[in-house]
């Protein structure tokens, strides 16, 4: 804009730097009284200086006037090879970018693999202005997949700097989402590293692969955790992403229309949504510390029921690590309850089933209840108490509360049945004690005479041992 504020010194975008500290650009305010040209009598060098100052201050009218003079070319290069368009893009001056492009500036110009589009995506300015600059450059056929010397593409710079709408526009214009730079970073990795949750959600929605590793073997979730972005770590590690690839089927025009008509206020309210799905499989794996296996099981369409009935050879066939197999098998052994087929037993056998097998059944049933209690406690501790800390937007809480109410009813029914079982056992025990024909077990019989004999034997043995010790002591003396 013609009256925009003073811009900073131009530097190469995307982490690049010039070979000389003197880049040819000057900082300062123009004297408005001497700003206009007085005819065509000024020397060429003075016009170049005025042109650079006009670019610095964003004086569009002066830039147009100097270009109209015909002495300065729209693709003129200054020190370290930057053109006026590259400089205008570096300060996110959309109006200057439009003027220069309309005058024939080359949108595909690059210097040392630094493109104008990369410069715009890494510019210091508002996202609104950066978005306008990027849109103008893309409309003039700037390639969104040309990388810099570090193999970083425009979408990586936009993701690194937190420009959600720019990322979406680049993808709509053909940018590759899963391209990796020289360190193996993708746009998703950069967003996770910098803590831009909205970018992470948008990239997942656009088909980003969260399983691509860096050169040192790190996943985006691990990069987020290392930089203490715990929300993003949880988002990438413990949740499914049903919206992944949602926009890939849209045409370029449909996607651009969707992006440009988005209400900025809605965007600030987290319009990029997904749903956390904690099913029985996820809870089971989380309880064993095997969260990393969730994606593997989902890819192979293995349900919890199938997992619990797998044999050892099936674990190996499906690519389970030996350590993970041992954890699952140990858990299955603890949960195993021997099924008792009462209908196949004779009347005499039914009377005898109330022994060790029945006790073992009750003990295992009690252990399973303990596991269920622990699972619920773990979920309670994992859920944030503040709704603002929820990483993903959830469905209506009414759905969750209705299921919880059903759980409470089932627990109450279970409690009632267990109480009935307890009363029945107590009744059987009372009848047994009052039955005159009942013969107590051998271990239950403890007569007065047997107790006296046991105590006498112990006393005699102890006294004899004491005499033996005394005798040995006197002999030594």
UniProtKB/Swiss-Prot annotation:
The keyword Cytoplasm applies. One of its GO terms (cellular component) is pi-body. Residues 274-336 form the SAM domain. Pfam families: Ank, Ank_2, SAM_2. One of its GO terms (biological process) is spermatogenesis. Its main location: cytoplasm. CDD domains: SAM_ASZ1. Residues 1-24 are annotated as: Disordered. It comes from the Eukaryota. It is found in: Cytoplasm. The modification Phosphoserine is found at residues 17-18, 20. Keywords: ANK repeat, Cytoplasm, Developmental protein, Differentiation, Meiosis, Phosphoprotein, Repeat, RNA-mediated gene silencing, Spermatogenesis. ANK repeats lie at residues 46-76, 80-109, 112-146, 150-179, 183-212, 216-245. InterPro entries: Ankyrin_rpt, Ankyrin_rpt-contain_sf, Asz1_SAM, SAM, SAM/pointed_sf. Plays a central role during spermatogenesis by repressing transposable elements and preventing their mobilization, which is essential for the germline integrity. Acts via the piRNA metabolic process, which mediates the repression of transposable elements during meiosis by forming complexes composed of piRNAs and Piwi proteins and governs the methylation and subsequent repression of transposons. Its association with pi-bodies suggests a participation in the primary piRNAs metabolic process. Interacts with DDX4, PIWIL1, RANBP9 and TDRD1. This is Ankyrin repeat, SAM and basic leucine zipper domain-containing protein 1. It comes from Saimiri boliviensis boliviensis. The lineage of its organism: Eukaryota, Metazoa, Chordata, Craniata, Vertebrata.
